[in-house]
Structure formats: structure tokens, C-alpha cells
Amino acid sequence: MALAGAPVAARSPRAVQVWLYAVAALIVLMVVVGGATRLTESGLSITEWKPITGALPPLSEADWQAEFDRYKTIPQYEILNKGMGLEAFKTIYWWEWGHRLLGRVIGLAFFLPFLYFALTGALRGTLLARCFGLFLLGGLQGAVGWWMVASGLTEHTSVSQYRLAVHLTLACIILTAIVAVARSLSPLAAQALPARVRLTARVLVGLVLLQIFAGGLVAGLDAGMSFNTWPLMDGHLVPAAGQLGAMQPLWRNLFENAMTVQFVHRSIAYLIFALAFLHLLDCLRLGGTAARRATLVFALVAAQAMLGILTLVHMVPLDLALAHQLGATLVLIAAMIHASDSNRRQIVA
């Protein structure tokens, strides 16, 4: 039952939409901070998962030393950071702590308004169910994050590229879902689009998510630190089959062979660029809002491709790598809005 006397504005779709877009912006920030945490090799600095008490950082020198001593027990310290001092440890600790704190902030930024909007009647029916589903996905993402970190605490000096890719992709799936729900609360556009345009818009979203997963594998394998030329890769447009399929069974190359993983990432980028361009031409013939949306999508895809090339040839500097990661979320948001507006039906609350 809705709260009696709740302000009308609090029950309006516009208020819900602003809330969802704000959470989406926080998720974009989370993806960038997560990228910085990975690139600074800070992700394993906190070796325990304490969802409640872990919100507080060490408050005394004794607390800091205890955290540092726990870090000294994992392979990353023994193999890569032996001899690291406490001050250097604090630097990587703050990155990971900030990443986890932001996750908690996002959880509260979603859950508290969710309760309020549900109690005031702004969320009902299908919209309520969808928002509750988003909350469950957020909880799953927290568990997946720890599952990823745990893979680097016992036998390896870094996290599993499989789990990193899943963690990143799930964050982006949540982002697309939030944007889709928020966009569905806007008035419907009058423009009717051919089925091929609606389908291509959806396919672009799927390809961008697939590319983000491939990018997670590239990051997890540090595959961007090798084959730092473009358009050639190891002197060829297409590397030798023997190199791309060096591992047995062959499927492992798609996930564990740095050359193959990078080649797949490049190939999906070419596919997205070509499809976005052809889709743009199709939408320009139709005109209207679809043409404007498709233009934005293609412009962001082109900018993201350029950022990817620069990141590669400069061997993954922090600023370019983070810009590339941010660019991926912007492409995804633009593609999702375009697909949503091209295909959606109004939610009946």
C-alpha cells in the first residue's frame, strides 16, 4: 500500500527515472574505478570479504599492520611485491577499499529509494518487479566480485581472467538493464521503424556486451601489453593459425592464449564498427530521431575504436586505458537507449 500523504512528485515516473539514471552514473564510475584498481594491481590488497564491517578502513597503525600482514600471506606479495613497505601497501589498499566502498554506496543508492518509491506507490506491477530484479542482480554482482578476488589469493598473483570478464560483463549487463528500465518511462516516440532497424539495434547491444567480455579477458591476461602494433598484429593482418590455435584443446585459445584473445577483441571491434556504420546509413535514410540516435552510436563507436588503438600502441598507459573503459560504457549506454527507443513498449505499472 502506498504511503498516505506522499508527495505527488515522488510518485511520478520522472522521479523514478532520475533515480535510475543516477544509479547508472554511479555504475559507470564503478567500472572506471574498478579499472584503475586492476591497472594499479590493487585488487588483491584486501584479502577478506566483510560486507558490513569492511566499510571501515584501518584506523590505527596496528590495524594497518594487521592488514599488511594478511596481504603478505598471498602469492602476489611473495612473488611480485616482496619487500614492499607499509606506505606503498596503503596506496594499493585505498584503491581496493574505495572500489568496495563505492559498491556499498551504489547498493544503498539503489535500495533506499527503491523502498521509498515502492511504499509511495511509484513502483507497481511490472516496474516494481523489474526494479526488484535489478536489486537482486546488484547483490549477485557483489558476490561475483569476491569470487573473482578469491581466485587470486591462493595460487596465482592475479585474478582469473574468466572471473574478471564475468565481473565486468555483469556490471555492464546491470547498467544496460537500468538504462532500459529508465528509458521505458519516457514518452513513446511516434516514429515507426522497419524490423531490420529494430533488430540491428538490438544486435549492436549484444555485440558491445560481447566485446566488453572479450575486453575483460584481454585485461585479465594483460594481452594488451603485447602485439602493440596496428593494423598489423605480429606483422600480419591475421596471425598464423598455428599461433592462434597453439593451445589444446582449441577452445582454450579463446580464453587463455593472449594472441588469440587480443585478435578476437580486434575482430569484434571491426564487426561493431562496420555494423554501426551500415546501421547509420539505414537510419539516415529514415531520418527522424532514429537517425540522430544512430549517429551518436556510430560516433561513440568510432571514438572508442580510436581510444582502443591508442591504448594498444602506447602499451596501456593508465589514462588511456581508463578512457577506453569509460568509452565502452558510453557506447553501451548509447546503444541501449537506441535499441530501447527503437523497440520498446510502454511499461504498464
UniProtKB/Swiss-Prot annotation:
Annotated Gene Ontology cellular component terms: plasma membrane
Reaction catalysis annotation: Fe(II)-heme o + 2 A + H2O = Fe(II)-heme a + 2 AH2
Topology in membrane: Multi-pass membrane protein
Locations listed in the record: Cell membrane
UniProt GO molecular function: metal ion binding; oxidoreductase activity, acting on NAD(P)H, heme protein as acceptor
E.C. designation(s): 1.17.99.9
Quaternary structure annotation from Swiss-Prot or TrEMBL: Interacts with CtaB.
Protein name: Heme A synthase
Species this chain originates from: Azorhizobium caulinodans (strain ATCC 43989 / DSM 5975 / JCM 20966 / LMG 6465 / NBRC 14845 / NCIMB 13405 / ORS 571)
Gene field: ctaA
